[in-house]
Amino acid sequence: MRILYLASLLFLITLYLSPTFGWGGGRDCESHRSEYTCKSDRSCAYLPFVSCCGKKEFFCVNRDHRNCCDDLSCAKNTRTGEIFEIWSSCKPHRDFVPYHSPNTTTCESLGCEARGMECEWVESSPCYGTSCCPRIPRCVGHHGGGHKCDRMRCPEGFYCEEQGGSACCVPHHDGCGNIQCPWGHYCVNEHGKCRCVPHRPPPRPPVDQCRNQHCPHGYSCRVIKGCATCVRDARPPHNLCRGFGCPEGSHCEVLEKHPVCVRNHVPPHPPPPPQICGSVNCGPGYICTIINGHPTCIRGDGYLCNQTRCPHDYQCETISTNIVKCSPKNDECKWHRCPPGSSCFNSRNGPHCLANNVFPQLCKVTQCPTDFSCKMIRGNPTCIKARPPVPPPHCSTCAELSSACNHVGMICIQVPSNCTNTRFPCCPSHPICIHPSTTAASTIATTASTVATTTSATTAGTTTGGTTTGGSTSDSSAASSADSSAASSSPSSSAASSAASSEPSSSAASSSAPSSASSSAPSSASSSAPSSSASSSAASSAASSESSESSSATS
């Protein structure tokens, strides 16, 4: 009796565990030929699995004691040769054997660089749609072609090296034999010098395109020709659709008792992932932000505050790129309203209103950034960026003064103006006449820096004077200043000026050239670039021949 009891118990245990162990032992759920009969059997599960080429197929498998939990593995159909990705612990057994991915090697283990070759990721055969069929590495020659040293056999103590596009044998103590390049680089010898150059990065492994795709009810995602496509779940076709052919990219459906071809649903491709600022290293005072999908370095809010020094118990706040405000740390005046002409002041007795004319001038203890000026606004010292001076409606150029300069043997140049008072219009530069010199570049630079302030003040006096005599005097003083600067830098000019000072002045020259120069040279200046016409040999000869006339005009 006891033996019969033990035999019955062993038989029950075998029936319970038979779906889990063995390949086809126990109850064979794979004998079911339809989805209905499989789902009607409680010991069976109807599960879909995907092949490497994107084919989705349903299998009736035995349930196990783990309720078919996730257990990723690979299996190969011995009848068709297809490789399926099995995502469940309930696996098909009939005509299936376990399959191990061939991707057991890496680029590091192949050691392609040591052989002067590159590592390249190639597709598995026949497809690489799942994790069971990933890309595998292999060694290839440079740029995907054969290596020229593959067929070269060097004698002992030598090795093959590609130099100038040709394979040659070099001794081990020379060339790239002892060069150890970092990972991702290989050694090349160019003109007798060795250097490490980077390899092409391997292509990224394939991504499961169906992972983030959502198909309508009754459809499942499949990768067809590299595109994620929603295909109707596998089920017996309708009787009317049997033998009804549809073109590629569509399938048969029965609508109002008639078979029709319906286009397969293709979900829209998601937008590419945005570039992030994690790998961007901006300089100090700059932050990274995404502009038009690209990481861009812009000035951070703290850049201006780093250059601002606020009063005690005040903190800096960047309002815009042109305004920086210093506000109290304990801003109790935030909700305190004051009448016009007064501002809130937070003292020891609390916030109260003070007239603006008696309000503490905190700008005296506030340091603003460069090109910013402090102004009290609503009781807070505020740094405001100074606006550039407004140019006048017309600025003179050398095109207007060159004829007058040439008449007295001089050339015209543009010099910067002294626009310190931004409340009035000011031209950034203005034309003046100087003596030509063989060292024109240094003379122009020296003259421009010397007469910038003097000329701007002189032209202002000419404008206010409004007479021909005043304009003539100002032009003469500008010319004298230019002569003295040119004389200090040019020996020939010094000799010319000393010779001119010993001769008597000519009233005829004094009454013609300077007056015409003053009438054609307005006080304002031009923002155009300085004249490109430098001194020439003709101008130099004219200057030496008319030195007495220019000296008379100057006096």
UniProtKB/Swiss-Prot annotation:
GO biological process: sporulation resulting in formation of a cellular spore
Glycosylation sites recorded in the entry for this protein: N103, N306, N418
Keyword Glycoprotein attributed: yes
Induction per the UniProt record: By exogenous cAMP, repressed by DIF.
Composition skew (Low complexity), residue ranges: 470-555
Alphabetized InterPro entries for the sequence: Dict_spore_N, Fol_N, Spore_Coat_Assembly
Entry's localization field: Spore wall
Protein name: Prespore protein Dp87
Region (Disordered): 454-555
Domain DSCP-N per the UniProt entry, residue ranges: 27-144
Record-linked SMART domains: FOLN
Keyword annotations of the record: Glycoprotein, Repeat, Signal, Sporulation
Gene Ontology cellular component terms for the protein in this record: spore wall
Signal peptide start and end residues: 1-22
Residue ranges annotated for the Follistatin-like domain, each copy included: 148-170, 175-197, 209-231, 240-262, 276-298, 304-327, 332-354, 362-384
